């Protein structure tokens, strides 16, 4: 059954809802802190995408899923990950405006991602939250 191979997709949908809410808050309120949270969540979603694909391969090897089910799962996860990329782009623009910088990718590289930074702390919290659900 397809639902057995879509393990984790419900969690991805909840994660997508959370990043959309944070993006909306960042945009409407011009909230740079919410924008940093969006950037961190986007990184978590990227990591979860890779983990879910890896787990699907393990299920394939055990004969628990089919290749066809894998295509469906991959399409769903990829679409959800693209949504997070768009949210990240919006958040990056909010951060640029807040910090008076130009160039989305330039600013994205400048975000402090070292342990102890706001970005890092949010990333670790969200990663723990969503990986616990896998």
Feature locations, PLM:
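Histidine- and acidic-residue-rich, metal-dependent catalytic cores
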Residues: 10-23, 114-123
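Long, amphipathic alpha-helical stalk/connector segments used for oligomerization, subunit docking
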Residues: 9, 19-41
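Long amphipathic all-alpha helical oligomerization modules
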Residues: 34-134
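Short, small-residue-biased leader/transition segments that mark boundaries at the very start
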Residues: 1-12
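Short conserved micro-motifs on helix faces and helix-strand junctions that flank
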Residues: 5, 27, 81-82
């Amino acid at each position: 059954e397809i639902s057995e191979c879509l393990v984790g997709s419900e969690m991805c949908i909840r994660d997508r809802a959370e990043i959309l809410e944070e993006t909306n808050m960042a945009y409407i309120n011009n909230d740079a802190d919410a924008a940093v949270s969006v950037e961190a969540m986007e990184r978590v979603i990227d990591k979860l995408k890779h983990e879910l694909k890896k787990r699907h391969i393990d299920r394939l090897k055990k004969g628990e899923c089919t290749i066809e089910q894998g295509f469906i799962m991959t399409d769903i996860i990829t679409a959800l990950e693209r949504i997070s990329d768009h949210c990240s782009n919006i958040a990056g623009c909010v951060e640029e405006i807040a910090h008076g910088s130009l160039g989305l990718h330039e600013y994205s590289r400048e975000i402090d991602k070292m342990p102890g930074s706001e970005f890092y702390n949010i990333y670790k919290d969200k990663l723990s939250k969503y990986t616990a659900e896998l």
